[in-house]
Amino acid sequence: MKKAILSVSNKAGIVTFGQSLIEQNYELYSTGGTMRELANGGLPVKSISELTEFEEIMDGRVKTLHPSVHGGILADRDKPEHLEQLQAQGIDLIDMVVVNLYPFKETVANPNVTEEDAIENIDIGGPTMLRAAAKNFKHVITVVHPADYNEVIDKLKNGTLDEAYRKSLMIKVFEHTNEYDAAIVDYFKDNKESLRYGENPQQSAYFVRTSDAKHTLAGAKQLHGKQLSYNNIKDADAALSLVKQFEQPAAVAVKHMNPCGVGVAETIDEAYKHAFDADNQSIFGGIVALNRTVEKSLAEVLHGIFLEVVIAPKFTQEALEVLGKKKNIRLLEIDMTIDNSEQELVSVSGGYLVQDKDNVKLNREDMTVVTEVEPTEAQWDAMLLGWKVVASVKSNAVILSNAKQTVGIGAGQMNRVGSAQIAIERAIEINDDVAMVSDGFFPMDDTVELAANSGIKAIIQPGGSIKDQESIDMANKHGIAMVTTGVRHFKH
């Protein structure tokens, strides 16, 4: 007669499943509450102690951790020496393990849970049996989800419980134990900081730190101000990522995950002035990131407007004294070393997406002039600055820039010409030294025509549309210099 161990915290359907196993010539062994549930359902069930000849101890903490259990589960039936060793020790084979774990997640979800309660709901024997059975899936059936009970019985009845299906059950086990262990780590690790709320007051939120490296937002040193909010953290990360792209002194202002002004110059004070002038309305209540030390002169300028967060590699003591007069402003010191991590992930319903970071760096030599007119040096400088910025703007993104600052930003529109219209409407200036920068190719020539009608004389875009030539012809018609990069910068 085959042997099955049943030990579940979720007892839904377990009596019916146990009865079906008996009908398939299984002998049932169980523990604690599961054994009582099966017995109360009228099923013949034996205590796990009859296998181990060892009584449960320490309030049930030790009951299945025994060679008579794990030897019977782990024995490779294809190895005669394993079977001989079992026989010598008087250990029987275990053919099925049905386990789901102590409800740790549900326990710690209670805001009044104590650490002692959490610890008592860390399952030890259950995961150990599951992992042992899953490792030996070729010979042992492992069931971790009640939703699989009916299918397992059906396959036992019709003889189709093959190795491929056993492997699918094995995968579910390791997914289950992985999630279980992750929940324990999340609860006990001191890397979780509760936030006042999420994007909106009706949403709870917390910040989980996976790194304390000084060049990351998680490793930043907060020098002043109240706790960062969920939105502060997201905007600060966007600002930090962009400002690190510049070697020369640079200032980046961000609002709702989009840059609203970017400036570069010989000094950080002048760079901030360019970023502020790029959009002196949207910067109000925003995040500012700077890649040089903030001294008193710049601090006095920053003090003059409402900002949520200021990020810099260093603040002088005099600058801190000036900015410290504003009670709520958050001041973050962060190492400006570029983050070389290669991947990023985003959660979606039921999982997450992982992708390589958009770290492609292009120089002028990597780009191609596709029009009759060549860009001027000033236009090249404008395009190179804009190309760094556009990768941080939500798609569809079209921006206008000169050599020292963004002059108009069109973000997040469902069509490219719409983004271009916004950038032009919001532009603080348009002249021969201003370039239009697009994160994606032009599907038709209407955006180029709009640029021409607005007085723009230089465009940089990825290229790659089947109608590229129409856009090039339109540029040539109006004497516009156009450059293609061969690289797209969509951002969602």
UniProtKB/Swiss-Prot annotation:
CDD domains: IMPCH. Its EC number is 2.1.2.3, 3.5.4.10. GO terms for biological process: 'de novo' IMP biosynthetic process. Gene3D superfamilies: 3.40.140.20, Methylglyoxal synthase-like domain (3.40.50.1380). Residues 1-144 form the MGS-like domain. Pathway: Purine metabolism; IMP biosynthesis via de novo pathway; 5-formamido-1-(5-phospho-D-ribosyl)imidazole-4-carboxamide from 5-amino-1-(5-phospho-D-ribosyl)imidazole-4-carboxamide (10-formyl THF route): step 1/1; Purine metabolism; IMP biosynthesis via de novo pathway; IMP from 5-formamido-1-(5-phospho-D-ribosyl)imidazole-4-carboxamide: step 1/1. The IMP cyclohydrolase activity resides in the N-terminal region. NCBIfam families: PRK00881.1, purH. This is Bifunctional purine biosynthesis protein PurH. It comes from Staphylococcus saprophyticus subsp. saprophyticus (strain ATCC 15305 / DSM 20229 / NCIMB 8711 / NCTC 7292 / S-41).
